[in-house]
Amino acid sequence: FFTAAFCLLYFKKTFTRPVLPALCKAAGAAIVWNLWFMVPLLQYMVQGVCRISGKYDAAYLYDSSVYLGQMFLMFGQSSGVAESIQSGIAGEMPQTLGLALAAGAFFFLLAVLDPAVRKSSRDAARIGSLTLGFGLLAAWCASDLCPWYALFRCEPLQALSKTLGKLQFAWRFFTPATMLLVVCACCAVVLYRKVRPEAAKAMAAALLALTIIPAGYLMYDKCTTSEAVTCMSL
């Protein structure tokens, strides 16, 4: 979805000689990389062991969306289930991007607002802007602010609603959002490193702390509350 949107955004460059072969190679590499999952799944489906059932639409995507406060939660419980948004967040699994990615996006905005920092690396500024834009789009699609239910109620878009419903859960947009915002945070550090190296070090340390501390808490919570996982097993 986001690859198609990117290609449409830069359609003049998409079909040029250096870009189109690179996109085809990336698509081929993605397919090969996922064969470890696709081949067994197809075998199970052919053998009748696994069947994909259930009809989903955009209304179901809204039901599985995430609150903004939940999206940037720093400390959450280590296990749980994906409840309906109408049931609140109690007992849900950790559905969060974390404060580290939010801080990375904020640092990048500070970088592009400073002309001296922004001009230090045009490539980093351009890549960071693209990843920030698409990353925020993915986060918006996962949030309860996205008008999934309005799309479901729009009769001319029923076919699109059913197609998008195959995603099943809105929080699956967290995967591309995470990868895109990680690149955005790295671009922020790169921009500051060339002009203000001390600020870049402080930003990198802050991002590292905001990543390690919640991860450590998550492991601690899992080891102390789960009956299946103990400290000895780790």
Question: Model regions: which residues?
Answer:
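Basic, alpha-helical nucleic-acid-binding regions used in initiation and control of genome expression
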Residues: E227-L234
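Membrane-interface helix-loop-helix junctions at transmembrane boundaries of multi-pass membrane enzymes
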Residues: K12-L23, F106-Y149, R196-A199
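Hydrophobic, lipid-facing residues on alpha-helical transmembrane segments of integral membrane proteins
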Residues: C24, G28-V32, L132, L136, ...
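Transmembrane alpha-helical segments
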Residues: A4-L9, G104-A111, T178-R193
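Conserved alpha/beta enzyme-core scaffolds, especially Rossmann-like or related mixed alpha/beta domains
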Residues: F1-A5, K25-A27
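Periplasmic/ER-lumenal interhelical loops and adjacent helix-loop junctions
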Residues: V19-A116, I127
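Membrane-interface helix-loop junctions at the exits of transmembrane helices
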Residues: W33-C50, L68-S78, S129-Q168, L210-E227
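Hydrophobic/aromatic-rich transmembrane helices and adjacent perimembrane loops
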Residues: P156-L191
